[in-house]
Swiss-Prot record:
Entry protein name: Nucleoside diphosphate kinase
Function summary: Major role in the synthesis of nucleoside triphosphates other than ATP. The ATP gamma phosphate is transferred to the NDP beta phosphate via a ping-pong mechanism, using a phosphorylated active-site intermediate.
Source organism of this protein record: Sulfurisphaera tokodaii (strain DSM 16993 / JCM 10545 / NBRC 100140 / 7) (Sulfolobus tokodaii)
Classification via InterPro entries: NDK-like_dom, NDK-like_dom_sf, Nucleoside_diP_kinase, Nucleoside_diP_kinase_AS
Cofactor (UniProt): Mg(2+)
The organism's place on the tree of life at top rank: Archaea
PANTHER family: NUCLEOSIDE DIPHOSPHATE KINASE (PTHR11349)
Location within or outside the cell: Cytoplasm
Keywords, in A-Z order: ATP-binding, Cytoplasm, Kinase, Magnesium, Metal-binding, Nucleotide metabolism, Nucleotide-binding, Phosphoprotein, Transferase
Pfam family, one: NDK
EC number: 2.7.4.6
Keyword Transport in annotation: no
Active-site residues from the entry: H117
Entry's Gene Ontology molecular function annotations: ATP binding; metal ion binding; nucleoside diphosphate kinase activity
Length: 147
């Protein structure tokens, strides 16, 4: 058993379409814990930090414009093998390749409006979490606190 933390963000289309509760519910039903949660409007410099690996690619400007177009919900999720479990749950970036039952398979409209972002490695998770959360903002669920 390897307890990990990962970063997840419900993108503007997911927020706009009122999918926040449904998405969070899927993670909780899978036994994952939400230990950090906030709704924010991302500014351009923050978006560029988050997606720095895509800088210079043809879709970069469209991605930055989209991710700054409305509020997003940022989460830190903790659980056994959280990075890979969450990646499986969200499905392929292209909704045509995402199986039904995955978040993108069920809700994504296109490659651009694909509802959700999740870190694809522990290293990226640490970097992405640090953009949006301070360590002291993360909360251990009460069920895990020993009294």
């Amino acid at each position: 058993m390897s307890i990990q933390r990962t970063f997840v963000m419900i993108k503007p289309d997911g927020v706009r379409r009122n999918l926040i509760g449904e998405i969070i519910s899927r993670f909780e039903k899978r036994g994952l814990k939400i230990i950090g949660l906030k709704m924010v409007k991302i500014d351009r410099p923050t978006a560029e930090r988050l997606y720095e690996e895509h800088k210079g690619k043809s879709f970069f400007e469209e991605l930055i414009s989209y991710i700054t177009s409305g509020p997003v919900v940022c989460m830190v999720i903790e659980g056994d093998e959280a990075v890979s479990v969450v990646r499986k749950m969200i499905g392929n970036t292209d909704p045509k390749e995402a199986p039904p039952g995955t978040i993108r398979g069920d809700y994504a409209l296109s490659k651009a409006e694909n509802v959700i972002h999740a870190s694809d490695s522990e290293e990226k998770a640490k970097r992405e979490m640090s953009i949006f959360f301070k360590e002291e903002e993360l909360v251990t669920p009460l069920a895990q606190v020993h009294m």
